[in-house]
């Protein structure tokens, strides 16, 4: 009886059929997770680059058109028109523009206001100041987006709100040039 059990146990342990299934089952989730994270990093990089480029172009327009006082909505529209991949930009972009006093420095808030996607209600701006000639201004844009693949390792590692939106923040500083009244 014991000999029969030993023989069957040796045959079972020596059998190599199906031996490729175990490594495949163990490695597949890791490889798929890495592939999804790679796609997520690419999408995040493209979104960040587009937001930063559009913000820089908008700031350049502000600096060149010294006689124009742009409103919050005009700047938001200019930034959103300068991007092609920021889905729902008008709804999930929030701007903050504050004056920076170089002589009496006060740190701006460390984190800009972002759109609250939980309620999708309009909340007042923390700060949006037009500024005057020779004044240093800080313009921050916060764009909220949903992850390309919520199952990826990167999407799970990024901070997000209750609705699953993640923030991309772009910052630009500029000096209001005086109007070009007559050289």
Which positions does each model-derived feature cover?
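Alpha-helical assembly-interface signal, strongest on the long, hydrophobic N-terminal helix that forms
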Residues: 1-83
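Short, conserved structural patches
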Residues: 3, 56-183
